[in-house]
């Protein structure tokens, strides 16, 4: 009988969006326990070694982390398998670079560079609101932060803007039709659009209908929706493609046009 937590992860069972080749070795880095789920996170080692190519091996990543160069959400993280996830800000002081983990339209974490100004805050989705001991209201976010005494106007599924230095809420966006959102799960993962309406299904999953900038409509579960802006103005900078998923034919035409203009 297995006792205790699992310590290994086979490469073939690793999440697809890490984009690890299956045949080079047997194991993949198993993310530590942390604020994001195993299937929805990106361990630091994969970000530094496979995405940024700052290291060739796991040992090199360990040497970088042990020098305390890497900060996630303003805190130094020396664990190479620390699970960074959606909306996290990764800062590398040595190079002066800041990144925000955001999905591209293919549902993978894009290497999205941001300005030092934007690296001071992050957006969090409100997962739960409850009243704790002595009647103190609490709020729990998608990245497992618990904040006491939030603004009473903030409700579930809203998005709050958090100042990373103080951990305090600076602003919030209501979950409402007409606001810009990003899909963080399901088949439409990584798409960005404006919420058009919400279907309530008591006892089942609420469905949200979204329309992207090209006028394409799609629907997804409420739990997959993350509001990122008021009206159609995003509060964060968006990765290349602005969250608009192209069909295979559109992608081909775009590639050919780029080829002709460069050729």
From Swiss-Prot:
Main location group: cytoplasm
Keyword rRNA-binding included in the entry's annotation: yes
Keyword Transmembrane: no
UniProt keyword terms in alphabetical order: Acetylation, Cytoplasm, Isopeptide bond, Nucleus, Ribonucleoprotein, Ribosomal protein, RNA-binding, rRNA-binding, Ubl conjugation
S4 RNA-binding domain segment(s): 42-104
Coiled coil: none
CDD domains: KOW_RPS4, S4
GO biological process per UniProt: translation
GO cellular component: cytosolic ribosome; cytosolic small ribosomal subunit; nucleolus
Entries under Gene3D superfamilies matching the protein: 2.30.30.30, 2.40.50.740, RNA-binding S4 domain (3.10.290.10)
Pfam families reported in the protein's UniProt record: 40S_S4_C, KOW, Ribosomal_S4e, RS4NT
InterPro entries listed in its UniProt record: KOW, Rib_uL2_dom2, Ribosomal_eS4, Ribosomal_eS4_C, Ribosomal_eS4_central_region, Ribosomal_eS4_central_sf, Ribosomal_eS4_KOW, Ribosomal_eS4_N
Cross-link Glycyl lysine isopeptide (Lys-Gly) (interchain with G-Cter in SUMO2): where in chain: 230
A molecular function (GO) term: rRNA binding
Xref: PROSITE patterns: RIBOSOMAL_S4E (PS00528), S4 (PS50889)
Subcellular location: Cytoplasm; Nucleus, Nucleolus
Annotated positions of the N6-acetyllysine modification: 233
Family: Belongs to the eukaryotic ribosomal protein eS4 family.
HAMAP family in alphabetical order: Ribosomal_eS4
Function of the protein: Component of the small ribosomal subunit. The ribosome is a large ribonucleoprotein complex responsible for the synthesis of proteins in the cell. Part of the small subunit (SSU) processome, first precursor of the small eukaryotic ribosomal subunit. During the assembly of the SSU processome in the nucleolus, many ribosome biogenesis factors, an RNA chaperone and ribosomal proteins associate with the nascent pre-rRNA and work in concert to generate RNA folding, modifications, rearrangements and cleavage as well as targeted degradation of pre-ribosomal RNA by the RNA exosome.
Protein name: Small ribosomal subunit protein eS4
Organism encoding this protein: Oryctolagus cuniculus (Rabbit)
């Amino acid at each position: 009988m297995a006792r205790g937590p699992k310590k290994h992860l086979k490469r073939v069972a690793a999440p697809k969006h890490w984009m690890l080749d299956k045949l080079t070795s047997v194991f993949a880095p198993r993310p530590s326990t942390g604020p994001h789920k195993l299937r929805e996170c990106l361990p630091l080692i994969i970000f530094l070694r496979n995405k940024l190519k700052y290291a060739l091996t796991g040992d090199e990543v360990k040497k970088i982390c042990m020098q305390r160069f890497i900060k996630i959400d303003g805190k130094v993280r020396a664990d190479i398998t620390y699970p960074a996830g959606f909306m996290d800000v990764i800062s590398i002081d040595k190079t002066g670079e800041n990144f925000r983990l955001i999905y591209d339209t293919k549902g993978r974490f894009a290497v999205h560079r941001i300005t030092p100004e934007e690296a001071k805050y992050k957006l969090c989705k409100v997962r739960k609101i409850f009243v704790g001991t002595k009647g103190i209201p609490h709020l729990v976010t998608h990245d497992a932060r618990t904040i006491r005494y939030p603004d009473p106007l903030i409700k579930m599924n809203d998005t709050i803007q958090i100042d990373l230095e103080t951990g305090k809420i600076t602003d919030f966006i209501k979950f409402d039709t007409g606001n810009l959102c990003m899909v963080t799960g399901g088949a439409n993962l990584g798409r960005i659009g404006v919420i058009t309406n919400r279907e309530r299904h008591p006892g089942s999953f609420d469905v949200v209908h979204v329309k992207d900038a090209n006028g394409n409509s799609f629907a997804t579960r409420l739990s997959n929706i993350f509001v990122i802006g008021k009206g159609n103005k995003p509060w964060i900078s968006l990765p290349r493609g602005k969250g608009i998923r192209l069909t295979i034919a559109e992608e081909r035409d775009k590639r050919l046009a780029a080829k002709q203009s460069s050729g």
